[in-house]
Design a protein with these regions (language model features):
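Short edge-strand/loop segments of extracellular domains
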Residues: 42-44, 92-97, 152-158
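Generic beta-strand structural signal
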Residues: 30-37, 48-50, 70-76, 85, ...
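Short, surface-exposed loop/helix-turn segments at secondary-structure junctions
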Residues: 54-57, 102-115, 164-172
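Non-heme Fe(II)-dependent double-stranded beta-helix
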Residues: 1-52, 56-63
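Non-heme Fe(II)/2-oxoglutarate
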Residues: 133-134, 138-235
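Double-stranded beta-helix
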Residues: 68, 80-138
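A short secondary-structure junction signal
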Residues: 48-54, 61-63, 84-90, 98-102, ...
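Short, conserved beta-strand element in jelly-roll/cupin
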Residues: 60-82, 120-123, 152-156
Length: 235
């Protein structure tokens, strides 16, 4: 389910967790930008496989390529995740560029790639997954469902002035107007969380501080979030 923050206030409040946003700042800088939000639901017995892949379509040949240029995702696990229903990754592959997955699969003798490991979590755990990391999942043949509250962030330099990849939203040039419009979800989320947890110290997002932008969380705010994900900063 894409654009999940417009459908679930629980997801919206999770999105604004101050400790998670501090991590986003430490990785992508204080002017980091949103990427995309989704709910991934993998039911027991019917949850399909997702082939090995690397996320990101835009910067693989960039002169400025580095291991963080396509951003990262937080993966918050509602029920936890296991080797049966969870995501598997091949550690270190986010650092080496685009991978020949067909050759890697052939060299490994099948889809169980040599060196791959599962992401195993307890309920409530949050994983950080680099989007360039080779990852995938197998059919959920077990008895436990997996629900992942997924949301990602970019370095501003990775998206400003860049033409989107057209995967999560229609391709467009991500100018400052688009980025500001897409970032409003952060303002609403922070305010929604503040209403729910008034004693908690809220995260201060630098771009809002610089522009003195003020948000309120109310019924009009909910309406303003409708289809916000059409501006997903998909690279």
């Amino acid at each position: 389910m894409l654009g999940s923050l417009q459908f679930s206030e629980a997801c919206l409040r999770t999105y604004a967790h101050p400790e998670l946003l501090k991590v986003a700042e430490s990785i992508n800088g204080p002017d980091f930008t949103p990427f995309n939000e989704a709910l991934f639901i993998k039911e027991p017995g019917i949850g399909a496989a997702v082939s090995w892949h690397q996320d990101g379509v835009t910067h693989w040949e960039s002169e400025d390529f580095d291991e963080d240029i396509h951003g990262f995702n937080f993966m918050a696990q509602v029920y936890g995740s296991t080797a049966v229903n969870g995501v598997w990754v091949l550690p270190g592959t986010h650092k080496i560029g685009k991978i020949d997955i067909k050759k890697l699969t052939k060299d490994s003798g099948g889809e169980r790639l040599k060196g791959c490991v599962p992401i195993i979590c307890n309920p409530g755990d949050v994983v950080i997954c680099n989007r360039q990391l080779l990852h995938g999942s197998f059919p959920n043949c077990g008895y436990e469902r997996r629900i992942t509250v997924n949301f990602g962030f970019h370095k501003r330099s990775s998206v400003l002035g860049v033409k989107g990849g057209g995967v999560h939203s229609a391709s467009q040039i991500f100018n400052s107007v688009v980025i500001e419009r897409r970032s409003r979800v952060l303002g609403y989320a922070i305010e929604a969380r503040k209403q729910r947890f008034p004693e908690e110290e809220s995260y201060k997002y630098q771009p809002f501080n610089d522009t003195k932008k003020i948000f309120k969380w109310n019924e009009n705010s909910r309406k303003d979030l409708k289809d916000y994900n059409l501006d997903d900063l998909s690279i």
